[in-house]
Amino acid sequence: ESVTKAICHCLDCQKRTASAFSVNVIAPREHFKVTQGKTKTWSYTSDSGKDYIVNFCGDCGSTLFGEPTRLPDVVSIKAGCLDNSGTNLGSMDAEVFVERRVDYLKPFEGMKQIVGMI
């Protein structure tokens, strides 16, 4: 199965990252596992009306990955927490929640522009 690399402009990602967007690797759940430690979770109702479960480090509080209950077969991994230069992902595939992009940013060239979630 494929992996999608997406920049998310939703308000929740902006707030959680204290930034204009978050960088995510959306991967099949069956190919994902936490290899060290134990995560803590909290959830909220997303724009889709479904719960979104946020998994974060219990020691430092960094967001690690999300579980959109609307899409139960995938996890949305925050690229900055990946080992082996996870933030150097090469080209990205899409921007999501483009309707919430902050005014001072332009669309990233060559990326699919998606209103709402994938």
PLM region spans:
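A short Gly-Trp-Pro
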Residues: 1-118
